Amino acid sequence: MRKRDLEGEFALAWRTLAPARAPGFEAQYAFHPRRKWAFDFAWPAVRVAVEIDGGQWAPHGGRHSRDSDREKLNQAAVLGWRVLRYSGQMLQDPEAVIGEVVEALERA
């Protein structure tokens, strides 16, 4: 499945399954002061982000793509972000994914 489709699945799951008290997300949130990196979904006030693996993480993704993603995630950690990553397979259990994100937000 394409990354855009997976992101749509996450957004729909969040809207339908997240508790009313949970804050809304910002999509494609640019988090780095100098690089053009963006998280798929972010809650900037508490520095929690979600990345949906797809596109470059598909089986054909090469070493350069993986290294670039590692650099992005390392820089996010340096800046104090907690990044949760989900695959298409994991999104097949939306209750578990959304529950985990809500838990991360509550602990932030």
Residue ranges and their predicted role:
Residues 1-108:
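Nucleic-acid endo/exonuclease domains
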